[in-house]
């Protein structure tokens, strides 16, 4: 799935859209990728020795999970980010645990692998691992919720 299809499932837009492509997706799993080489944030974090901020790695995981929710777990049929039908999908409600290992550099593709661990009504618990060059860079567990858009 390329980014134009991702945009139908997520409200995020550049420069904050953190899913460039989806490699694999199912109702319980998503593998997405992000290329940060020319991203605006990398020039200032840190000049001369750029690294991708941990908060951005978390956001990549959250957005990948949001794609999965929009595609397979939306409370309305044919969800489209332009026609939300009254819902905000995949709103971050909790970061349960986050561990960052090593430095994630913006000059290589970042792989994000997210697994749906539990679903109860409109609450979704996920675990995610962020990889770069085949090595784990972060392990994150978090919760997203679907809410009526009038609560935003």
Range-by-range predicted roles:
Residues 11-52, 56-57:
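Catalytic strand-loop segment that frames the active site of acyl-thioester-processing enzymes
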Residues 13, 33-39, 94-95, 105-113:
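Terminal leader/tail segments of proteins
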Residues 66-111:
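Hydrophobic beta-strand-centered segment that forms part of the acyl-chain substrate-binding groove
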